[in-house]
């Protein structure tokens, strides 16, 4: 079998389990271009279906698109299934302690977060799901505050808009370190088709108490802890005018509210 033929078979198998009409259509168009003999399309197909994005201490990060070398719903579901298997194998109380899931405002971040919640819930793990986009440190802090066994943050941090990512935090609120990264990667490698995973609807999981939506109450507690850490609490900030830009990030609400709680009411974003 030629390399092109094997990559095409991998692509067709991927297409058969892709739940996202956008990436499915993208892959169909790529295959059509390959059939027409487009050398750039053939090279693109080969790159997308040679190996996969590697899971490490920083989790996953890649360009959005179809195929295992891109960030997409198929990959997120498989990675989450591997994470769930590793957590359950690592701790007897992983299921009741649960996993915190946060996300930023990038393209597909909410969808990836909800898919993550459904896969974890289907594996019997309790899920604490952010109700809106929020900064990464909020997720890490929530892991320790809620006593969860892990946290997932859907974000690509400073990368350009075409990217998205998937960060994992351990029960201590810190980004995972060895041997957890390789253990999770090994568990991911054992996962089969993503469309065969147990993925109850979110509403069903909410009714069962398996998914709990995290509201502004948790965010307020987080900001209160942040304000406690200010270096000079005696400063009168009422007359100080502050301009802030989130630079396309999700920090605006946190910064505005945090500064207000710290005594700096004149914040412009």
What residue ranges belong to the model's regions?
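Cofactor-/ligand-binding subdomain signature composed of acidic, glycine-rich
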Residues: 2-78, 190-197
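Gly/Ser/Thr-enriched, mixed-charge loops and adjacent short helices
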Residues: 14, 18-22, 44-53, 164-269
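Gly-rich Lys/Arg/Thr-decorated short loops/hinges at beta-loop-alpha junctions or inter-strand turns
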Residues: 54-70, 97-100, 118-122, 195-214, ...
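Short, glycine-/Ser/Thr-/acidic-enriched flexible segments
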Residues: 60-62, 67-69, 106, 134-135, ...
């Amino acid at each position: 079998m030629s390399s092109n033929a094997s990559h095409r078979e991998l692509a067709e198998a991927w297409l058969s389990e892709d739940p996202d009409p956008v990436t499915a259509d993208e892959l169909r168009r790529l295959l059509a271009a390959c059939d027409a003999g487009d050398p750039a399309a053939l090279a693109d197909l080969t790159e997308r279906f040679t190996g996969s994005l590697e899971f490490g201490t920083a989790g996953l990060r890649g360009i959005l698109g179809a195929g295992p070398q891109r960030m997409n719903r198929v990959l997120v579901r498989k990675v989450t299934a591997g994470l769930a298997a590793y957590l359950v194998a690592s701790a007897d109380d992983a299921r009741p302690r649960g996993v915190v899931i946060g996300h930023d405002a990038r393209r597909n971040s909410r969808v990836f977060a909800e898919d993550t919640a459904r896969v974890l819930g289907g594996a019997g793990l309790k899920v604490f799901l952010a109700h809106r986009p929020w900064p990464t440190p909020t997720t890490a802090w929530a892991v320790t505050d809620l006593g969860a066994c892990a946290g997932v943050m859907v974000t690509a941090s400073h990368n350009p808009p075409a990217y998205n990512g998937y960060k994992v935090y351990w029960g201590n609120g810190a980004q995972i370190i060895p041997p957890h990264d390789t253990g999770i990667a090994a568990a991911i490698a054992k996962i089969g088709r993503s469309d065969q995973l147990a993925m109850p609807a979110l509403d069903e999981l909410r009714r069962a108490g398996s998914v709990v939506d995290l509201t502004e109450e948790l965010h307020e507690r987080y900001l209160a802890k942040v304000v406690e850490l200010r270096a000079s609490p005696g400063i009168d900030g009422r007359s100080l005018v502050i301009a802030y830009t989130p630079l396309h990030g999700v920090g605006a609400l946190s910064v505005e509210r945090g500064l207000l709680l710290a005594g700096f009411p004149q914040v412009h974003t």
